[in-house]
């Protein structure tokens, strides 16, 4: 089980990423655009650097929805490998069953 503070920190990051997504995308478009001048680019870089650090999507970490475990995360289910196996064995995940051949 991950600490509650770690889960809260990730929730805060998710909220910040959603809040600043448009602004960040617009600034990145100016920086990478060929039609903008060097001065405009530099201003965009400075504005991008002044945004909160946690508003970058690369700062987010995929975590299990049940335990908050950061490793062994399966995106398709939103669970760690351990919790996926437990829920699968109880028959709570439709379409999955234990392999047998």
Curated annotation (Swiss-Prot):
One of its GO terms (biological process) is translation. It comes from the Bacteria. GO terms for molecular function: rRNA binding; structural constituent of ribosome. It holds the Pfam family Ribosomal_S14. GO terms for cellular component: cytoplasm; small ribosomal subunit. Keywords: Ribonucleoprotein, Ribosomal protein, RNA-binding, rRNA-binding. InterPro entries: Ribosomal_uS14 (IPR001209), Ribosomal_uS14_bac/plastid (IPR023036), Ribosomal_uS14_CS (IPR018271). Gene3D superfamilies: 1.10.287.1480. Binds 16S rRNA, required for the assembly of 30S particles and may also be responsible for determining the conformation of the 16S rRNA at the A site. Belongs to the universal ribosomal protein uS14 family. Part of the 30S ribosomal subunit. Contacts proteins S3 and S10. This is Small ribosomal subunit protein uS14. It comes from Colwellia psychrerythraea (strain 34H / ATCC BAA-681) (Vibrio psychroerythus). The gene is rpsN.
């Amino acid at each position: 089980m991950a600490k509650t503070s770690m889960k809260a920190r990730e929730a805060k990051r998710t909220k910040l990423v959603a809040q600043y997504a448009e602004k960040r995308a617009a600034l990145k478009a100016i920086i990478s655009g060929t039609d903008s001048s060097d001065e405009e680019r530099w201003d965009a870089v400075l504005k991008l650097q002044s945004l909160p650090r946690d508003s970058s999507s690369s700062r987010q970490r995929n975590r299990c929805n049940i335990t908050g475990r950061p490793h062994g995360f399966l995106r398709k289910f939103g669970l760690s490998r351990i919790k996926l196996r437990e829920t699968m064995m109880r028959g709570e995940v439709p379409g999955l069953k234990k392999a047998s051949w």
